[in-house]
Amino acid sequence: MLAMWLCFWGHAEPTLLSSFQIVAAGDTLVHRRVKKTARTKNIINENGVTQNNGGFDWILEDVAPILQQADIAFVNLESPTDPDFHRPIRGEVFNAPVDFLGALSTAGFDVLSFANNHSYDQKSEGLVRTLAEVENREMTAIGAGRSCAEAKKIHIVKVDAIRVGFLAITDLLNINENTDVDTPCVYLPGPKCQKNCTPDRDAIWYHIDENALISDIQTAKRQVDVLILSFHWGIEYRTKPLSLYTALAPKLMEHGVDVLLGHHPHVLQPVVRHTRSNGDEGVIAYSLGNFFSDMGKKYGMYPTSTTRGKTRDGILLSIDIAVYQLENGQRKITIPKLAPIPIWTENANSNDNPQIRVRRHSTILKEDPSRKAFVEKRRQAMSFIEGLSD
């Protein structure tokens, strides 16, 4: 490694300024039976107050220690949380209880992407209310705002002396209520796509203006040492990214993105290391898959006969990032460790007691060694994810 640095960056040995760990999770889909699971696990005290965030803590308790020990934990918030209900919940129109946000906070999440196709499911009012509820729980929602300036604003987290910046963007919406730059807004990459658009059921697709996006990235990178971009993109249920995105991602990395976190397909796609022309190291995750949902319920709790059910496979993407300073004052980035932690959404496929929750493969196997065949089958289904940990 040092020899490579000297080749790229000169002859002086770089000085380590700091290192940190980010853990990233994929799509949170609070379907009806996810809510039912939480209600059945809710613990209420004598005053009628929930003691475990409406039961949502139970859903996340196995992965919480991983998130809590990270310096920064990220997830895609794929549902508004507005108690006032501006649209009925039906089909692909979502709304989650605010207790769900409490559970995300308790589990250890810090940064939530709210730039996705469900941002306006509860209209503009629901978007604004969700932002407030997130802030009330000492987390930050990125990619959506009370104005377009707020939606596009970089969120900066300080880790020791390192400035870590976050941006979030989506190239599709189910409902678009972006009406003016000074009203509620979701960060979009360009105008509405009019022809040769990527099909994804009923979503509205947006053209990616590469020049404008790269300009935004360059502006953001000048303010931080490490830049993390959340991008809601792709086609649902495809395990291979479109060529559109495999061509775009390296360009975005070259212009300043250090970690690119993709989501929307609801299944895993490749996670790859990337090295910029100046020697900086980075990571591209084309899709983090689902963090949890009610998808794929028909396969039972622990299927051993199929690699299907990929909407229930996911990862906690653990990335160690180190920032060095050179003799000339420049800062350089390495990825000393990339460890995707495999997870599985348990689902009893029962209307009365669905028991939906996120579980690490290692926990499933520890609790019952006879589930080894199941774990091996799931790892086979995600074999294209490089460097899977236990």
State where each predicted segment sits:
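Bacterial N-terminal signal peptides
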Residues: 1-7
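Acidic, metal/ion-coordinating pockets
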Residues: 11-390
